[in-house]
Amino acid sequence: MEVLTKEALLVKNALLNKGIETPFKKIYEKNKPDIHKISKYIKKIMDLLNLDLNNDSLSKTPNRIAYMYIEEIFSGLNYNNFPKITLIKNTSKINDLITVNNIVLNSTCEHHFLIFEGKAIVSYIPDKILIGLSKINRIVDFFSKRPQIQERLTNQILVAIQILLDTKNVAVAIKAKHLCVKARGIKDSHSKTLTLSLGGVFKSKQNIKKEFLKDF
């Protein structure tokens, strides 16, 4: 079993303490899902749908889905995959707004296991620590690679960055289109969902909140 990085442990414990961690049944790092077992159950589902698993086009589908779940679209369930974080001392005393916008995200609705996709914007006002800009994108990507609801995803990103940078002054917004809304039920192909999570001065000062949202 791999040892989690200090940053991964900090973030994981913070989410647990705030009650916004993804609802795990067991500790994932000790019980990594078995691709072969998942493949077997996918095969059973396909068989119950009367699909011919001897067909060349379908025969490898159970293995493909199992691999995709564990190694790709749900890889964020495993904190061993938490990105390596570059933290920098704020020796330049930077205290202005830093924003990364147009962060493309793809996640999976935990209710129907259908994709939702959109963009995120993340801002923070540094105190003693700065973070490498690409690491913000990687944090968004890590938490997106789970069965999710958009509201919790937004909060998880916020808390992760607050903990790593030791500041409350963080804001996260996500605007996404959900395939579970587009492809089933109401079948609305136009609507998008906007979620906000604000901390520190982003919540208490309207001018800073307005600045954060101006290009979103």
Curated annotation (Swiss-Prot):
Alphabetized GO MF terms: GTP binding; GTP cyclohydrolase I activity; zinc ion binding
Keywords, sorted A to Z: GTP-binding, Hydrolase, Metal-binding, Nucleotide-binding, One-carbon metabolism, Zinc
EC number(s) stated in the UniProt entry for this protein: 3.5.4.16
Gene3D superfamilies registered for this protein in UniProt: 1.10.286.10, 3.30.1130.10
Pfam families: GTP_cyclohydroI
Catalysed reactions, semicolon-separated: GTP + H2O = 7,8-dihydroneopterin 3'-triphosphate + formate + H(+)
Subunit record text: Toroid-shaped homodecamer, composed of two pentamers of five dimers.
InterPro entries named among the record's database cross-references: GTP-CH-I_C/QueF, GTP-CH-I_N, GTP_CycHdrlase_I, GTP_CycHdrlase_I_CS, GTP_CycHdrlase_I_dom
Source species of the chain: Wigglesworthia glossinidia brevipalpis
UniProt xrefs under NCBIfam families: folE, PRK09347.1-1, PRK09347.1-3
UniProt entry tagged with the keyword Calcium: no
Top-level enzyme category: hydrolase
Protein name in the entry: GTP cyclohydrolase 1
Entry GO terms, CC: cytoplasm
Gene behind the chain: folE
Pathway: Cofactor biosynthesis; 7,8-dihydroneopterin triphosphate biosynthesis; 7,8-dihydroneopterin triphosphate from GTP: step 1/1
UniProt: Zn(2+) binding residues: 109, 112, 180
GO terms for biological process, alphabetical: one-carbon metabolic process; tetrahydrobiopterin biosynthetic process; tetrahydrofolate biosynthetic process
Lineage: superkingdom: Bacteria
Family per similarity comment: Belongs to the GTP cyclohydrolase I family.
